[in-house]
Amino acid sequence: MNLSATLILAFGMSMDAFAASIGKGASLHQPRFREALRTGLIFGVVEAITPIIGWGIGLFASQYIMEWDHWVAFSLLFILGMRMIVEGVRNRPDEVEKVKRHGFWLLVATAIATSLDAMAIGVGLAFLQVNIVHTAMAIGCATMIMATLGMMIGRFIGPLLGKRAEILGGVVLIGIGVNILLEHLGYLA
């Protein structure tokens, strides 16, 4: 795969993380650049690892994985999205404290859910002449950039939305999950 195809793939794969990080940035109400960069790093690392895992799986059992990856991604994103919506509706101070304490693991779970399509791409890459390490690094770097940018965009949207920002973030995650499911079921091109 040539450089331009790799970059197109990398930035295409980063769009789910970009959308999810906009919602996350909006729900945090003025996240600092350090928080945005941390989010970008988490999303980028996970998004770089999953195509390598998919590539390894593709060498052995692609038909079994491809049947279920979209259901797993949809389920994770739906559950995380519903949790954000419920927390946005409740919006009690003690729950905000709890969310901040567990923020790292919620970010990791969201990153995993949005990167399952990268794992599926990795399965497909196992059948092509590609350097999987270079491709995975490109995907990870593009995702880090886009997720960091998404958080900063969310920073400006959050104050406008107020308490509804977390609800919007949950709706975005559910929307990403539904999109992944519909694409894999053949309803979207």
From Swiss-Prot:
User: What is the protein's membrane topology class?
Assistant: Multi-pass membrane protein
Q: Keyword annotations for this protein?
A: Cell inner membrane, Cell membrane, Ion transport, Manganese, Membrane, Transmembrane, Transmembrane helix, Transport
Q: Per its UniProt record, what Pfam families does this chain match?
A: Mntp (PF02659)
Q: What is its main location?
A: membrane
Give TM regions: 3-23, 41-61, 65-85, 103-123, 132-152, 167-187
The family database entries (InterPro entries) matched by this protein are listed as: Mntp/YtaF, Put_MntP
Instruction: Please provide, alphabetically and separated by semicolons, the GO molecular function terms listed in this UniProt record.
Output: manganese ion transmembrane transporter activity
Location of the protein in the cell:
Cell inner membrane
Q: Which NCBIfam families match?
A: PRK11469.1
Q: Matching PANTHER family, A to Z?
A: MANGANESE EFFLUX PUMP MNTP-RELATED
The family database entries (HAMAP family) matched by this protein are listed as: MntP_pump
Q: Which family does it belong to?
A: Belongs to the MntP (TC 9.B.29) family.
> What does this protein do, in the record's words?
Probably functions as a manganese efflux pump.
Its name, as the record gives it, is Putative manganese efflux pump MntP
